[in-house]
Amino acid sequence: MAQLHDYRDRYYDGSGGGWHPLTNFNKSSTASGRIDLGRKKGREDAANIISNLARDKNNNIVETIKIITHSMGGAYGNGFVQGLKDYIKTLPIEQQKQIKITLVADFDPYGAGDIIADPDIKTLQFKHKNDLNIFGMGWLANENESGLSKENIRTNTGTSTDHSIFTFFNDISSLSEGTYKWNGSKWEKQ
């Protein structure tokens, strides 16, 4: 994650083990199921994630948490954030104030219509849309997440409309490191 100057990244399988329609119908097959799986994992890993955040010489947390998702991972990541926040609420108030989730970036989130963006966190959605791009699956993930303004949803209908994460490198390069704050009408970088 050099783009965000974050070198202690973690990777999770947001599909919950994959979708296998011919062999089973598990939680991973629906957005709500993946949200539940993500929330459980977020709660489970929160203490470890927080204990490993960078600190200054006074032991104050100086590193932020950023969530980057793709496809089925969008719903999983949404639940993961909920799980992190559930855990953070159990901590002393002074520590809660130090822990910041500063960005969620969802790339072609599958089932986005069932995702409600957290209003306390800057969230960006990137989509590649082309219903005629059959083999590149440009038709697959074209719903908007609830709670996002039009300026936080970026849709490419031209140069690249494939669903693959590899086609989102230009979008990834637009992500900006920093902390964002809601000013009442839009997110502002601090």
What are these regions (language model features)?
Residues 1-62:
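Active-site catalytic motif of lipid deacylating hydrolases and related acyltransferases
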Residues 18-32, 116-190:
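C-terminal catalytic-base region of ester-bond hydrolases, centering on the histidine
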Residues 36-144, 189:
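Serine-dependent carboxylesterase/thioesterase catalytic core
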Residues 7, 11-12, 19, 76, ...:
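Sequence-level detector for tyrosine residue identity
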